[in-house]
């Protein structure tokens, strides 16, 4: 009895029009991996640098949520510490305004930023094309004596 309902449901699915989704873009196959160069030709790679303390500090200082939470808790308890927390939040806002004003490109209009982004994307695309072109060139090995 259950198989009849399943079959009827499948027939209904078959009669539905296909969804109006755009076709997926055609994906290019990845290039074949190159064998690693010989150990003697390999140059020592510098170790990756750990994130700078200033960068880590900046990420930690950007969160306003703990201060806002503390202010709300003080308001619920009618605590006298609320003025201190509000002043801390105000100082943090001023500090973040200074950080934002020193960011590169902040002086540009949104249109100029979009133009710069398009130029940079075009440069990346061109460089990737050149890289693929150079990778596909026939490489000749120097005979060993």
From Swiss-Prot:
It comes from the Eukaryota. Keywords: Acetylation, Activator, Coiled coil, Nucleus, Phosphoprotein, Transcription, Transcription regulation. Residues 16-38 have a biased composition (Pro residues). It is found in: Nucleus. SUPFAM superfamilies: Mediator hinge subcomplex-like. Disulfide bonds: none annotated. One of its GO terms (cellular component) is mediator complex. Its main location: nucleus. Component of the Mediator complex, a coactivator involved in the regulated transcription of nearly all RNA polymerase II-dependent genes. Mediator functions as a bridge to convey information from gene-specific regulatory proteins to the basal RNA polymerase II transcription machinery. Mediator is recruited to promoters by direct interactions with regulatory proteins and serves as a scaffold for the assembly of a functional preinitiation complex with RNA polymerase II and the general transcription factors. Belongs to the Mediator complex subunit 9 family. Component of the Mediator complex, which is composed of MED1, MED4, MED6, MED7, MED8, MED9, MED10, MED11, MED12, MED13, MED13L, MED14, MED15, MED16, MED17, MED18, MED19, MED20, MED21, MED22, MED23, MED24, MED25, MED26, MED27, MED29, MED30, MED31, CCNC, CDK8 and CDC2L6/CDK11. The MED12, MED13, CCNC and CDK8 subunits form a distinct module termed the CDK8 module. Mediator containing the CDK8 module is less active than Mediator lacking this module in supporting transcriptional activation. This is Mediator of RNA polymerase II transcription subunit 9. It comes from Bos taurus (Bovine).
């Amino acid at each position: 009895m259950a198989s009849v309902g399943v079959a009827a449901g499948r027939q209904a699915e078959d009669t539905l029009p296909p969804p109006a989704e755009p076709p997926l873009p055609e994906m290019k196959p990845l290039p074949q991996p190159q064998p690693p160069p010989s150990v003697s030709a390999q140059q020592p790679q510098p170790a990756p640098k750990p994130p700078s303390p200033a960068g880590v500090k900046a990420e930690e200082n950007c969160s306003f949520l703990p201060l806002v939470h503390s202010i709300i808790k003080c308001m619920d308890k009618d605590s006298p510490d609320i003025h201190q927390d509000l002043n801390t939040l105000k100082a943090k806002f001023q500090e973040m305004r200074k950080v934002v004003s020193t960011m590169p490109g902040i002086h540009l209009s949104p249109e100029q930023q979009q133009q710069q982004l398009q130029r940079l994307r075009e440069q990346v695309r061109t460089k990737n094309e050149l890289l693929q072109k150079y990778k596909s060139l026939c490489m000749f090995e120097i005979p060993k004596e």
